[in-house]
Amino acid sequence: MTENKGTPEVGWSFDTRYTDLPSMMFSNVEPEPVEAPKLVILNDSLAQSLGLDPVALQHQNSIAVLAGNEVPKGAAPLAQAYAGHQFGHFTMLGDGRAILLGEQITPNGERFDIQLKGSGRTPYSRQGDGRAALGPMLREYIISEAMHALGIPTTRSLAVVTTGESVFRETVLPGAILTRVAASHIRVGTFQFVANAGSEEELKALADYTLARHFPEVEADRENRYLALLQKVIKRQAELIAKWQLVGFIHGVMNTDNMTISGETIDYGPCAFMDVYDPETVFSSIDTRGRYAYGNQPRIGAWNLARFAEALLPLLADDQDEAIKLAEAEISNYAEQFEHHWLNGMRAKLGLFNEESEDLSLIKDLLEVMHKHKADFTNTFRALTFDEQEETGLHDKLEFTEWHERWQARLGRQEQTKDDSHNLMKMSNPAVIPRNHRVEEALEAAVEQEDYQVMERLLKVLANPFAHSPEQKAYAKLPAPCAIPYRTYCGT
């Protein structure tokens, strides 16, 4: 491993504040070099927003950085330690196949983690090889960028590099490394790790770092600033999970190590988007009991946040009973905050600007009709946007006809015009989502044929989900019956 000195001016501007934290929270480790790195996809617009030159990033020396073969100046590679409740069971974890290069400082002073996923073994790899297969890395690229375009807080994908090496899973697969960009990789599980294995001073150091990085508006001398940290994280997660529900996104593995403190969606292993509306929808092959089903996600969010509150207890009050009382009061606010964001989002999807007491029943009645008649979630709301009742597949159902009349009457009680409602719905109801069969089609072409054009076309369509353009229609079609039920795998 060598420090890279010959790369053209890419624009790397690394800082390494995470290394100021107690050493128990990370291990210094360099990426393992790969045989023949090749850049297969680069996110030009994200690169530019980070202050990086997309042309220079395609230079061979820059590709070596993205592959982990060279370390850029100022970087301090490390793997982060964390814990987590995985399907409800607590375990000590850590970055087993991901290495944080450092924090990129953008031209406007923002700070983003730059992480290489699939870059080799770390002290936390256990029995893993530290590597990643091409398919799951491309999948994360597609889904994370689609989520960003949908306006949902998420980690981002800067690039995918193939390694020229094979990884061995159920079959032999081409290896790859994803460059992931995040506001940070601090998780609920990070706090759980320190609370279980560290001292109160180490926990305080992590909390202070997190407040400074993500919530600088919380003053250092504020009374009980750690309670403010809990409040801020609850608020962000309530809003995030509401946004998931509004587009039919199913994370698939909502373990506490996959809940970020920043409020970004992270870890796209077994995730997928719901086609037919059903609250019990599960895609993950390992979620055999439906713990992380679509309809359970809000409740799991509350459960995870309760684990975060438990980790913070020593900082909330000297008296444990008082600390528990404070934590419980904040956790009890989560459900109301979630419903507020979800209800406002559903109103927007139906073109409603103001609030009425019957709105919740109007929304739930529509969802019940959709569930009963197996209507597509995304396409139903898109059809309502353009008043194309036949496109819903519900137009000949009496329950829907009666509901539609109620909805029209509700719209008529607003000051806003029908055009206003139509425009609000266009901005709130995507024409396209990353349909599972379309994602698989793109991955199959890339992995099996080294054809990235299918993926590039898909990414182009997904980049403007609210455009409602003619070319998006083909990507809005449902999967063939033979593609159902769809199953996802974590890719590890």
From Swiss-Prot:
Transmembrane segments: none
Gene Ontology molecular functions: AMPylase activity; ATP binding; magnesium ion binding
Residues reported in the UniProt entry to bind Mg(2+): N258, D267
Signal sequence segment: none
Entry-linked InterPro entries: SelO (IPR003846)
Needed cofactors: Mg(2+); Mn(2+)
Enzyme class: transferase
Enzyme Commission number(s) from the entry: 2.7.7.-, 2.7.7.108
Keyword Plastid: no
Top-level division of the source organism's lineage: Bacteria
Protein residues bound to ATP: G94, G96, R97, K117, D129, G130, R180, R187, D267
Family: Belongs to the SELO family.
UniProt-recorded name of the protein: Protein nucleotidyltransferase YdiU
Gene name of this polypeptide: ydiU
